[in-house]
Structure formats: structure tokens, C-alpha cells
Amino acid sequence: MPNLLVLVRHGQSEWNKKNLFTGWRDPGLTEQGMEEAREAGQAIKAKGLVFDVAYTSALSRAQETNRIVLEELGQGDIEIIENEALNERDYGDLSGLNKDDAREKWGEEQVHIWRRSYDIPPPGGESLKMTAERVLPYFEKEILPRVLKGERVLIAAHGNSLRSLVMQLDKLSQEQVLALNIATGAPIVYELDDKGGVVRKEMLIEREAH
């Protein structure tokens, strides 16, 4: 089996459902989110994939997704590493606000710039560029070497931390990554060559991204 890396964004959280900016706040999964995580695990299992190690963030929605996926695979006892380097982008002063309320407070154009520019952070928060600057060094130092040793790796994380990884793996430009949305609970399977280049990529579930 070529070097295997599977990415999965956490299932729908309570705050996704309420249309709130979440960031580093820590709501749990909804019933739908748990079901999305189960479906992710079942889709991975149907492909006959298993893992040697799983990485996740310091936030419970990703940890819960990771746990459910591994349970579906009968792999709840493998090594699990939690690290805040994989956390969601910190939305700063937007965290906990309804997206419509934020638009009312700061204006639709300004909120759109914060959400969809690469390097402009919201007040007290992170841009996508800043998120990538903590995600990618951790990936390259801690995770990629294990993949290249032949270990099969799962990463259960967040929309923006995973966008940072996909940007690097798929060699996307800043403009391309801004158009990229990663659906909840939809595994992305990568096979990498011995230098970390992508040999093959497969989306296991087609789900609309929010």
C-alpha cells in the first residue's frame, strides 16, 4: 500500500447548526454530526483502510469525530495524538457570534473580507495564512515523516486547518484555497510518494460544504 493519509473534517457541531463563528470555542457534535462521523468511518471501512495512528486537534468536536470514526473501524485502541496546532482558525472577536449578527455589526463586506481573504485576520483572531503557519510546520515535523515511514495516518480536524493541508498537498494558490470548502464528515484519501507528493486523491463522500 502506498503512503496513506486520510483527512476528515469533524461532523456538524452545535454551533455549525446555529450558524455561529466557532473557532477555538468548544461545542460538541449534533446528532447529525455524530451520524456524519459514523458515515465517514463506514466509508473508510468499505475501502478496506486501517490506520496506525490518528491525529486530532485539542477541540472536542474533532476528538469526538476521530473517536467515532475509529470505533466504526474497530480501531479504538490505536495511538491518538491531540495537538492544538490542528485547531480550527481562531475567529477572535467573531467567535460565538451568529454570522448574520456579525454582518449587522461590521457590515457584510468587512465580514466577507475576514472570512474569505487569505491574510486579513478578524479582530483578535487568525487569518487563513496564520492558521497555515501553525498547521504546516506541525504536519511537516510530526505527521508527514510517519506517513513516509509507511504508517497509515488519519487526521480528524477542522475546515480551515484542513484547508491549509490541502493547499499544500494539492499545491493550490491563495485564490484557489479561498474557493475551497471542505464538507463535514467527508473523508479525503491521499496516497503519497516517498517525497510527500500526491500520487492519488479520492473523496469518499460527496457532501455539501457549509
Swiss-Prot record:
| Organism encoding this protein | Parvibaculum lavamentivorans (strain DS-1 / DSM 13023 / NCIMB 13966)
- Which SMART domains does this one have? PGAM
Q: Does the keyword Isomerase apply?
A: yes
Q: How does it assemble?
A: Homodimer.
Kindly give the Gene3D superfamilies that the UniProt entry links to this protein.
Phosphoglycerate mutase-like
A single GO molecular-function term is:
phosphoglycerate mutase activity
The residues annotated as the active site are H10, E88
What family does the database annotate?
A: Belongs to the phosphoglycerate mutase family. BPG-dependent PGAM subfamily.
Q: Which SUPFAM superfamilies match?
A: Phosphoglycerate mutase-like
Catalysis: reaction(s): (2R)-2-phosphoglycerate = (2R)-3-phosphoglycerate
Q: Which terms are listed as keywords in the entry?
A: Gluconeogenesis, Glycolysis, Isomerase
What residues correspond to the site Transition state stabilizer?
H158
The record's PANTHER family line, in alphabetical order, gives:
PHOSPHOGLYCERATE MUTASE
Residues recorded as binding substrate, renumbered to this chain, are: 9-16, 22-23, 61, 88-91, 99, 115-116, 159-160
Q: In which pathway does it act?
A: Carbohydrate degradation; glycolysis; pyruvate from D-glyceraldehyde 3-phosphate: step 3/5
The protein's job, in short, is: Catalyzes the interconversion of 2-phosphoglycerate and 3-phosphoglycerate.
Q: What is this protein called?
A: 2,3-bisphosphoglycerate-dependent phosphoglycerate mutase
Which Pfam family, just one, is annotated for this protein? His_Phos_1
Please tell me whether the keyword Isomerase is annotated for this protein.
yes
| One biological process term in Gene Ontology | glycolytic process
Q: Give the domain of life.
A: Bacteria
The EC number of this protein is 5.4.2.11
